[in-house]
């Protein structure tokens, strides 16, 4: 009996909080449609950001390849020494 009263209490609390949330919607939810209407001037920024990200990715890949080659050379030298 106590468990069922507890469950009923939880349901009442759930519906009460839902009612409060519907009465006072989140301001961020109102701002979302405004943020969706991004001006066309933001497109070049996106393109330059993408180019910068691609350059950074290429630099990271080159550094990783150099590190791998250096590690392989060091391992080969250590193996040759015995």
Swiss-Prot record:
<keyword id="KW-0677">Repeat</keyword>
<dbReference type="GO" id="GO:0050825">
    <property type="term" value="F:ice binding"/>
</dbReference>
<keyword id="KW-0964">Secreted</keyword>
<feature type="modified residue" description="Arginine amide">
    <location>
        <position position="81"/>
    </location>
</feature>
<dbReference type="GO" id="GO:0050826">
    <property type="term" value="P:response to freezing"/>
</dbReference>
<comment type="similarity">
    <text>Belongs to the type-I AFP family.</text>
</comment>
<keyword id="KW-0732">Signal</keyword>
<feature type="signal peptide">
    <location>
        <begin position="1"/>
        <end position="23"/>
    </location>
</feature>
<comment type="function">
    <text>Contributes to protect fish blood from freezing at subzero sea water temperatures. Lowers the blood freezing point. Binds to nascent ice crystals and prevents further growth.</text>
</comment>
<dbReference type="GO" id="GO:0005615">
    <property type="term" value="C:extracellular space"/>
</dbReference>
<keyword id="KW-0047">Antifreeze protein</keyword>
<dbReference type="GO" id="GO:0016172">
    <property type="term" value="F:antifreeze activity"/>
</dbReference>
<keyword id="KW-0027">Amidation</keyword>
<protein>
    <recommendedName>
        <fullName>Ice-structuring protein B</fullName>
    </recommendedName>
</protein>
<feature type="propeptide" description="Removed by a dipeptidylpeptidase">
    <location>
        <begin position="24"/>
        <end position="44"/>
    </location>
</feature>
<dbReference type="GO" id="GO:0042309">
    <property type="term" value="P:homoiothermy"/>
</dbReference>
<dbReference type="InterPro" id="IPR000104">
    <property type="entry name" value="Antifreeze_1"/>
</dbReference>
